Amino acid sequence: MIPGEIIAASGDIELNVGAPTVTLEVSNTGDRPVQVGSHYHFAETNGGLSFDRDKARGMRLDIPAGTAVRFEPGQTRSVTLIPLSGKREVYGFRQQVMGKL
C-alpha cells in the first residue's frame, strides 16, 4: 500500500440506491452555457434554465459528488433528481429558501 492510496472494493458502486427520483426536461434558454454541480439545490439554478421548478424544490442532481452537468445554449436534456438529505435546510444559492424545505 502507498500512503494515500485508495483501494476500492471490486464491482460496481451504486449511488443513491432506493432514493426517490424525479426526471425533468431542462432547456437552456440563455446565450451562455450553464453548469450545475452535484449538490446544488436544483430549483435555484440559473434563471436561464427552463423547467418545472416546483417539482425540483428540495432536489439535487442524481450524479456522483463533485461532478456537474453542463447545459449549452439552446440545449434541452433530461435530468434525474433526488431529494437533498440531512436536515433538509437550504441556505445561500439564490436565497429563495433560506431555511427548512
Swiss-Prot record:
Reaction(s) the record says it catalyses: urea + 2 H2O + H(+) = hydrogencarbonate + 2 NH4(+)
Q: Which Pfam families match?
A: Urease_beta
Q: What class of enzyme is it?
A: hydrolase
Q: Which domain of life is it from?
A: Bacteria
- Report the record's Gene Ontology biological process terms: urea catabolic process
- This protein's pathway: Nitrogen metabolism; urea degradation; CO(2) and NH(3) from urea (urease route): step 1/1
> Where's it found, cell-wise?
Cytoplasm
- Subunit: Heterotrimer of UreA (gamma), UreB (beta) and UreC (alpha) subunits. Three heterotrimers associate to form the active enzyme.
By sequence similarity, the record places it as follows: Belongs to the urease beta subunit family.
What is the protein name for this chain? Urease subunit beta
Q: Which organism is it from?
A: Rhizobium rhizogenes (strain K84 / ATCC BAA-868)
**Lineage, top ranks:** Bacteria, Pseudomonadati, Pseudomonadota, Alphaproteobacteria, Hyphomicrobiales
